[in-house]
Amino acid sequence: MNTARPPGPRGHWLLGNVVEYDKDRIAFLRRHHREYGDVFSFDDRTVFTIDPQLTHQVLTATNHDYVTELGPFAGSSALHAAGEMISPWMRARRVVRPALADAAASGMDARIVAILDAVLDRTAGRDVDVLPVMLDFAGHAVAELCLGEDAAGIPELLAANHAALLPFEDADYQLPAWVPSPRNRRFVRVHRRTMETLTRLVAARRAEPARRPPRDLLDVLLGAHPAMTDKSVTTTLWSILVGGHGIPAAALTSIVRELAIRPRLAADLADEAGPPAGAAPSAGAAPSAGAAPSAEAAPPAEAAPHGRLPLAEAVVKEILRLSPPAWMMTRVARTAVTLGEWRLRPGDEVLCTAFLIHRDPRWWSQPDEFDPARWETARPAPGTYLPFGAGSRYCLGAAVAMRQLTLATSRIAQRFHVHAPNAVAAEPEFCGRLAPAGLRAEFRFGE
């Protein structure tokens, strides 16, 4: 076993590799992957891995040998605090898993379609920035899943949190939390307001008589035996809300880009969904901006996509392969551990680069080609397909996200022609959640 650090670029004597990495992140990773192999160092505490087996090892050892990313204000005690959170978080996952499975098994199909219709009806016929529109949809969908009739205002808080986090996602150095920079103050202010709102909602629901069956995930969490603390319930809600907001929105933005580039694919998806009933709504009938979508906005059930949608599902799987929103997953070593032939120290970061694994010709035929048909036979080996991670921290809402993305893909193709003149030029942006940068589109009602 080698006790030295993995090899890697030395970089600038003062700034290391930060400047070169920020110029073109994926080009930096590709170049040094070719030069140093599947494991290489970025600096003396950070290692990249593009090896599927080692990546699978790291992800499946999370909670034991590793913890998940520590966040923008991680201090000296953050590693210990993250370890302390493992047990309550894993218990919360066990509590909500059955409810999420029910939601994925078409339990929310009608509402997902109704929410998407309401959001897109507000913007139809106008040139719009696609990512904020998809964030609006995903925010309403996950807020309703978690909080049901108490979801009012939550999508707006999720949008504010997303905006407050963006500066951190594009930065390689973070000022300590106590430094009163505008970026820090904004993040702390928005996050505090969100957590205070969730805390009030949890306390108010706790004071109500228990509902059977539970209406939403908050009811499920409050009905756990033994009882969860309000703090644990609030933290769990927050984690699910954030995970169900940014990732589906980024994936849908990539899907919209493909629908604009590939009209034949869009037509095939529309055929699979079947014709929508009724005419396109008039401008006056659309919900006002910012209004929560209502159940009355839903079309007749038979008009919406439903049941198995194999082509739409294959398109989603292929988008998640080519453009995984969680394109890089960070784990932090809890103790001294080994990564292949290398030894890591407590606090060392391992960056698992799903994007490059998904496009590696060793694991995928024609890896850079968009080919939904590959999913008719594809059976990815462990560690080679990681849109939702792996191991004990595999995305809790993966099945819900797949159903939501499949329905949304089908519904957009069924109702709209997507016109996006900059679709080809809107390349993925490798910071935070991977999505086409600056994609603009017009959703035109189909004829």
Spell out what each predicted region is:
Residues W13, A101, H191-A251:
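Conserved cytochrome P450 catalytic core segment spanning the I/J/K helices
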Residues G16-G37, E302-G340, P361:
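Conserved cytochrome P450 K-helix E-x-x-R motif and the immediately C-terminal K′/meander segment
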Residues N63, C352-R379:
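Conserved cytochrome P450 K-helix/beta-meander segment immediately N-terminal to the heme-binding cysteine loop
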